[in-house]
Amino acid sequence: MKTRMHNGSRLLSLLLAVVLVFTLTVPALAADKPQDMNLRIAVMSDLHYLSPDMIADTADFEHALNSDRKLLKEGSSVLREMFKQVRADKPDILLVSGDLTKDGEQECHASLAKQLQQLQQDIPGLKIYVINGNHDIRNYNAKNFNTPDGKAVPATRTHPEDFKRIYDFVYSDPTVIATFTPAAGNEAGGLSYVARPVEGLTIIAMDTCRYSKENTSNGTDEHETSGAISADLEKWVIEQTAAAKARGDLVIGLEHHGLVPHFDVEPTILPMYLVNGYERIAQEYADAGMSVVFTGHMHAVDIAAMTTKAGNTFYDIETGSALTYPCPVRFVDLRRSTVGGETRTYMSVSTKTHTGPIHYTAPATGTAHVIDDLTEYAREFGFSTDMLKTVAGDFVKSFFGKYLPNDTWPVTKIVANIDQIIDDVAAVPIVDGKDLLDFANWIYQCNLAGEDDGNYPAWVQSGIDQLKSGALLDQVLNIVAKDAFGRGSVLFTKFQGLFTRYLKSQLNDLLVNIVVSMSVDNNCPDDNDKTILLEGSSAQVRLLPVTGSSAAVTQAYVQGSTATVFLTSRQLRAATNAQSGATVTVNATDPVADTVILAGHSIANARSAGVAALQVQFAAGTVTLDSDALAALDLHKDVAVSLTGASLTAAQQRALGSQAATATLASASVTVDGAAESYPAGSVRASIPARAADALTAWSLAEDGAISAVGGAWDAQQQTYTFDVVSGVTAIARFPFTDVPAGSWYYGAAAYAYNNGLFDGTSPTTFAPNAVMSRAMLVTVLWRLAGAPAPKGVNTFSDVPGGTWYTDAVTWAAENGVVSGIGGGCFAPNSNVTREQTAVILFNYAHSRGYDVGARADLSAFPDAGSVSGWAQDALSWANAAGLINGTVYGGRTILDPQGSASRAQVAKILRSYAEHVVNA
């Protein structure tokens, strides 16, 4: 019994374990269906906001400016203009990846928070998520420079609880679904949180900053530049990521410090810009399901990626500072859709720079200024001798401590003469007109701007060659020795002796690696504009040429025959050489696409770049949107441009008649978010190869076969026909009649009659629409409509001579009961046919062909109904019911006018209706 009980307990335990495992694992294995998304995200970083109220024209503030490259004086106005850009862009989400303030001044946090809240009020539905940077919390550098005596005083420092309180509109937002709580007694990571702004997207904001004693290198509650993620925060992030993936969400991270190096030697020379243990943590985050992290800190525009052993790719998208060159704002279009059971998610990143004009009043002096181009303005605030003199002393001490720890005796002399040394080193010539300071700024700024593509100007290449040869380092060391110790002195010689060939080789190799690493991006070189496929086949991301007066490329997300592109300001500036008035062409012929979606803010960017016309090149031809169309289209919606061949409905086939086999057919369209868009006539035109012929014209064919004229012209040199884009099928065909106006009520009927051989022209180029129709003409038209059959008998009308153009038609009509003449053996072929005669002849024709003629209409509403001849009443009632004769307007009234004559235009329209409503009903 005991054995049986023991085995039963084991079995029960096993069953319980299976149930427990199944219960815990099924939610993770059976993740919710991924939600479709179409989101616009604005990304800013390192705002370093310093309130104008805390700025004064003092020596202390000047010292602060010389210690940095930030546009602190202009900062308030710069942010105002950037927020204006965000308002115009109308994003769904704004992310700010840390360093919100200059140095964590609580007054600045409070002011910035109000500005962000106002931005949120101005953009309905906007969600804002911020995270702190190393400058923002417990920063002893927080100062107020605007004091009565001109001496800077400490500003109110911001503590973690202050940050949460000030940005309560973020932390208390209903979309914030979790916050991180550190272990008792700890604070590290305590500002981290999770937000779910929409179904399908989870954002994990991670506090990677060091400001509490358990997380700082010296054990104090004081900020440090470097970043760290504690073990408990790391575990929490992984758990939150896994939970988000289980509910089918895409997971995006937000933090200040980097998780992937942005240039090769960053871990060596600037490790404080990466989170500690970044390699392991990035792999764990990626394998847990996080796809992207938005970072800042380095003030550079860069995208870097790494792939784990499990095959998961992780992107670190770094955004530069708003207040240092190139002063960027990122805009991200996030698209997710499930097609055929496959989830496809892609993110298109674009970078907006060259903001301007910016009007600002210098807080310190009250003088007014205008910044025409913020990026070019900030370019001038690179490394300067004043800035280098301010920070060089600490660098010298650090250098000797690292490379010559046993020979620190030169430090005092070097620091004492640092100003002269800096001036002389900066002035080392590279080529005529360019010195070493220019060289350093070029290398650094190309990295900051994400322009580190290895395309060096000749003078920069010369500097690199001199650096690689060791010549530059020799010059620098000689200058230091001369300025610090005096040329030829004992200390001069002793100093030079410190730098052995081995040490100089080490230093030179390091300098070369730094320069090359910062100017040649070997990891995701498309730092400013990149389409990233997060879920789906990588083969779906392709490059499309963009050409204007110059050339560029754009990335396209290709699904079948549709290519989605995000034209960025940067690409358009490159394609137009930053000059307005150019036509820019997007080439969609390789891969072949018949629809190009100009997504995100492509239209807005084209307008802001001064593009005169935006053209899409398809295999079938081109579609061009001119400036009027660009001005009319919605700036914030996707515009789909399409050009394909076309297949015809049966009604369209009949409308083209004999020309169906020879006409050039196309289907062109411009739609906005899937719906037809209105734009000025003639502002959107397509060009397609067409067969050369006289009197070519463009027709729009409705599904029911109705023909209308489309503006267009033949280009004999290009052998193309250019026409206005309208909805539906466009046919390029021959139509020789110059007396049929394009907008006339009978245009389509005349074209139908011509295409089907029902009417001949009165001359090679005239239709004579207002000429009266004779009885012979009408009968001949019906005979042709029947296929021009040979009559079986002989003509019996005395006034219809043999051998005329209408003899066979009249003979056929008489023997088939279509006409019976006017009496006395006569037909009166040349008499004008009246409207009621037309109705009778059509009725007889329909009856003889076996068509349904049972419909009847009440004609009593027509004021002249009583004037209808008795022999015509039944036929006219049928013709009205069938939609053939609907009355004519005369003297402001609609009348039947039964005895009135019928013009060629009227009969053509009646026959078009007859063919569709009776013959093909």
What residues fall within each predicted segment?
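Sec-dependent signal peptide cleavage junction
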Residues: F22-K33
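N-terminal active-site segment of His-dependent metallophosphoesterases
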Residues: A31-H109
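Non-catalytic terminal accessory segments
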Residues: A31-K33, I358-T547
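His/acidic metal-ligating clusters that form di-metal
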Residues: P34, K90, T202-A205, T216-T313, ...
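Extended active-site neighborhood of metal-dependent phosphoesterases/phosphodiesterases
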Residues: S111-K235, A310, F331
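Proteolytic cleavage junctions
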Residues: V546-A551, A556, T662, S667-N755
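Proteolytic processing hotspots in large secreted/extracellular or virion-associated proteins
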Residues: T564-E703
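Feature responds to low-complexity, polar/acidic, surface-exposed segments characteristic
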Residues: G711, Q717, T722-Y747, N755-N756, ...
